[in-house]
Amino acid sequence: MSPNVSRLCRWQIILVLVSMLTSTIAGGSPSSRFFLQPHDRVVFYGDSITEQRLYTNDVATFVHTRFPKLPVTFINSGVGGDKVGGGWAGPLNVRLARDVFPFRPTVVVVMLGMNDVLRGHPLSAYEQGYQLLVAKLKKHLPHVRLVLIGPSPFGDSATPNKINDRLIVMSRFVQRLAKQNGGLFVDFNAPLVSAMARIGQTSPKLASKLIPGKIHPGASGQLLMATALLKAWHAPSTVTAVQIQARPLATIRSDHTTISLLSRHAGRLTWTQQDTALPFPIMNLHAHCPQFPPISRTWTINSLVIELPYSGPPQLAAFTNPLAQQVLRITHFYRTLDAQTLMVNGLNAGNYTLRINNSIVGTFTQGQLAAGINLAKYNTPMLQQAYRTLRQVWRISSMRYFAWRQLELTLYASTANQTQTYVASPWVHVKPGRIDNTSAAQRAVKQILAGYSKLVHLQQLRLFHMMPALPTHYELSPAAGPNAHSGGK
């Protein structure tokens, strides 16, 4: 063998090994391109737009379903009314010391600016306050990775307005600040304005619902925000990608899944998949999602009122949210962030019914299956498991919100005369009022807070135990009826 051929063979072997390694990394664990890594602790810091817990829970749900084995925790520390210098929940020093630093975050995501604009603060004050915020984060958390977000827009249409013009100027400053401090900048303003313009061309009324009330984006608007953040984090587009050849019977492709028991009998194909990821459960596609989600839901049993943590809006099979549909369309969401493709080649002409775990997913033509279908659009067992994950993410955020806002803040928000103001709680019936720092009531609240902190931790462990994706059994058989249907979301 000549030296040139020998070198060529060595390079071919190296390329094959690199390809195998890349494929292994991509399945079920983040690649080096994805922003989050094992054991990251992510704190979302901001105002009421963050406090809504919509885009933050979308992001958390995406990460937990796309990377089921990735140990990452998410904490929402958004407070309504906050500015770069703080707000009613305390000045900046208090906010950071109580609501950020104790979690030892490796990633801090910041979005602030709306209240600074609405209260008429000059741009210079915003810039100085933001610089101080970043400096304190870097001093206390030397290795923190900063994600600075250009604030979401003001207004319920794409028509320019003075308030949003100021937000855009602030966003440009945030972009420069992120670059100066080695952080990542993500723009939330432009995607929402662009979406309002595109949807408004055919349905202005529908477009106005992206930001009801002009300040707080609804669930569809915040899905756009989550999409922008996930793309900036290099989130992978693929859930799974499967290609099966019917004749001769073979597995051609099995990205992010393991295929076993592939067989063909009397025109019927069957196989089993063990996926390493789940499709993304879109919270408001088949649900009426409140703009400001509650922290709990009430159940009445034999006149006994029980409060349980809010686990997201109920999914309604007969309802499809037209605004969510438009957002998915203009962002090409299923192609760019939620591709769960199944391709079957070599079938005879005709229609075929796909069943997963004995449940009918849909009936498809031979041509549709050869081109590939995106299972993320269908009500599959995998999507149902993903919705269970979504509900658990909401339970955790609701319990954390309750423990923090209705217990912890009563212990820390001291007034000038060293007393505490207690807020009425829907879970713990503490009488509202002012009590001193040494009272039995405050000690009781501390005990309850400690108990809820443990409960939140247990719920986080339960979330990880819900993973990974469960094995699924596929059956593709000739359809009895003459017509195919696409079904799906």
What are these regions (language model features)?
Residues 15, 26-80, 95-104, 225, ...:
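Serine-esterase "nucleophile elbow" of acetyl-processing enzymes
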